[in-house]
């Protein structure tokens, strides 16, 4: 069963999608946090749901559009809005779905936002966290690998820019300044490390493999390299392998 719905609070309307057999009898929710320029209908989430729901009963996969992504109505992306969206969705899972066992699957920008959330709130709302190709160096990735020279010129003139890959996102200089100052590589995650696993492709062309490996070593986080996988894990067999590791981790 797949259901689309909105979580509405004053000033916010978060576009969500939930996949599961019987949403009224849930014991576990895995919150999928997509990457920069992504959306709630990402194929990776569907592949994961298909594999996970066949192995975990009374479980649902919930995915939502980050601010300024997918069908979200916010015009410009801010880290503050991302934090608020994640808080609202977590509140919905606990208070409306009445589920206490919440895990997280974050990819790329979504992985960055999950780790930022742990630091900013000094707590972990998830029983387990599995990240695929997390953008630990988010500022460098946006500025060096995503933005065009024209984007950079427009920013110097005080203009907002549309940037991204397949789908563009509206950002401004203040967003970049925030990313630069909110560098998760400078923060300590040792208190949360036992409940985190990071999977990364050795051929990731967006998020440098060695940067993520170093991040996991510094924080004693379980690290699973996938040979020859790119950033999006476009090879379905490699995606299935990554998901198999995640599913066992979430079941533990």
Residues of each region from the PLM?
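The serine-hydrolase catalytic nucleophile loop
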Residues: 37-50, 210
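Conserved alpha/beta-hydrolase
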Residues: 49-71
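Gly/Ala-rich beta-loop-alpha elbow adjacent to hydrolase catalytic centers
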Residues: 106-114
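The alpha/beta-hydrolase serine catalytic core
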Residues: 77, 112, 124-215, 219-225, ...
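Active-site glycine-rich loops that stabilize anionic/oxyanionic intermediates
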Residues: 34-39, 202
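N-terminal cap/lid segment of alpha/beta-hydrolase-fold proteins
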Residues: 1-23
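Short beta-strand element of the alpha/beta-hydrolase
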Residues: 26-35
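Catalytic nucleophile-loop/oxyanion-hole region of alpha/beta-hydrolase
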Residues: 67-99
């Amino acid at each position: 069963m797949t259901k689309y719905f909105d979580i509405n609070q004053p000033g916010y309307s978060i576009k969500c999608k939930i996949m599961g057999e019987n949403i009224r009898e849930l014991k576990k929710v895995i919150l999928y946090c997509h990457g920069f320029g992504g959306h709630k209908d990402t194929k990776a989430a569907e592949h994961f749901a298909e594999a996970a729901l066949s192995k975990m009963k009374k479980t649902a996969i919930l995915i939502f559009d980050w601010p300024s992504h997918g069908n979200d109505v916010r015009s410009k992306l801010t880290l503050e809005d991302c934090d608020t969206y994640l808080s609202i969705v977590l509140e919905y899972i606990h208070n409306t779905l009445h589920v206490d066992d919440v895990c997280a699957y974050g990819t790329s920008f979504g992985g960055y936002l999950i780790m930022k959330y742990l630091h900013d709130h000094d707590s972990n709302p998830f029983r387990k966290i599995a990240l695929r190709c997390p953008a630990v160096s988010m500022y460098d990735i946006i500025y060096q690998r995503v933005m065009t020279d024209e984007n950079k010129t427009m920013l110097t003139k005080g203009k907002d820019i549309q940037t991204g890959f397949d789908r563009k996102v509206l950002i401004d200089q203040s967003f970049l300044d925030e990313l630069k100052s909110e560098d998760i590589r400078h923060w300590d995650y040792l208190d949360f490390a036992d409940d985190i696993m990071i999977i990364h492709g050795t051929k990731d062309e967006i998020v440098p493999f060695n940067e993520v490996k170093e991040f996991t070593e510094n924080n004693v986080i379980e690290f699973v390299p996938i040979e020859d996988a790119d950033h999006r894990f476009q090879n379905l067999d490699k995606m299935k392998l990554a998901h198999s590791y995640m599913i066992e981790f979430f079941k533990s």
